Regions:
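Extracytoplasmic/secreted envelope proteins and their assembly/folding machinery
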Residues: 6-14, 29-33, 37, 75-79, ...
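Structural recognition of the beta-strand scaffold that forms the well-ordered cores
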Residues: 23-26, 80-81, 154-156
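A mature extracytoplasmic/lumenal domain signature
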Residues: 25-31, 40, 48-50, 159-161
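C-terminal solvent-exposed extensions
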Residues: 73, 129-227
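Mature, Sec-exported extracytoplasmic domains of Gram-positive
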Residues: 3-5, 21, 44, 49, ...
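Surface-exposed patches in mature extracellular/periplasmic domains of secreted proteins
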Residues: 21-28, 46-49, 112-119, 184-191
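Second-shell loop/turn segments in exported
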Residues: 1-3, 18-23, 83-92, 106-111, ...
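Flexible, polar/acidic helix-loop-strand segments at domain edges
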Residues: 34-115
Length: 227
């Protein structure tokens, strides 16, 4: 097995969520930073300061990502925004990571990401790999383009929904299946009016998530992603 870590992770995810994962892509932290730089960065509305550095590291917390509207993050700052652990909870960090992924989906052109991803892989300086066959690239690009116009939902298997020390795997699989089924139904063409709280082009939504921010049917309403 060429990538045993990837295969082990894939197997755990499939068993836990009840999903079949056909393809994967892997990029290390330096490669991620380089990819974000290569596509021109991402923009996010940031609600609170995010520290750069570690209280346990030699430099400590040495800088901050400041809050603001439509903040542009390069690769270095996008990586720290997603992974910073100080002065926050694991659940808050999970949400920041989801917001980064949502921003990438909304703002980046799939064909550009593919080109830059391949360029980074060819350079050989970072760990970049995928099992996606060349013949499936066009299909994945089409899916990515369709995904840009759809809301990204989120569910986190954390307390009180799931107890980490004694997870109910049957419940997890049921929730995943229900979420996917609901998203497929909502994506179907409908003559009904737009849901309340949805944003129209050029406007912003003020809808609050019905539960916690990590449990939402539309990350745009939580992350305020700039398009």
């Amino acid at each position: 097995v060429k990538y045993p870590g990837v295969e082990a992770t894939k197997g755990v995810i499939e068993e836990t969520l009840g999903l079949k994962i056909n393809y994967w892509a892997m990029i290390d932290l330096k490669g991620f930073q380089q990819l974000i730089n290569a596509v021109g960065g991402i923009r996010l509305d940031i609600g609170k300061r995010v520290p750069i550095g570690s209280l346990h590291g030699p430099k400590g917390v040495y800088d901050w990502i400041e809050p603001g509207k439509n903040v542009k993050l390069d690769g270095f700052h996008a990586l720290w925004f997603a992974r910073s652990r100080e002065y926050s909870t694991d659940y808050e960090r999970m949400l920041r990571q989801k917001c980064v992924m949502n921003a990438m989906l909304r703002q980046l052109k799939p064909e550009t990401v593919l080109t830059k991803f391949q360029a980074i892989a060819d350079a050989g300086e970072q760990i970049v790999a995928t099992n996606l066959p060349a013949g499936e690239i066009g299909t994945m690009l089409d899916l990515a383009m369709k995904g840009k116009s759809q809301p990204m939902g989120s569910v986190s298997f954390t307390p009180p929904l799931i107890v980490p020390m004694n997870p109910d795997f049957a419940k997890i699989r049921r929730i995943v299946a229900e979420k996917i089924a609901a998203s497929e139904q909502s994506a179907a063409p409908s003559a009904s009016a737009s849901p309340s709280g949805s944003a129209t082009p050029g406007s912003s939504t003020t809808t609050k998530p019905k539960s916690t921010k990590n449990q939402t049917d539309n990350l745009d309403s939580v992350c305020k992603v700039s398009s």
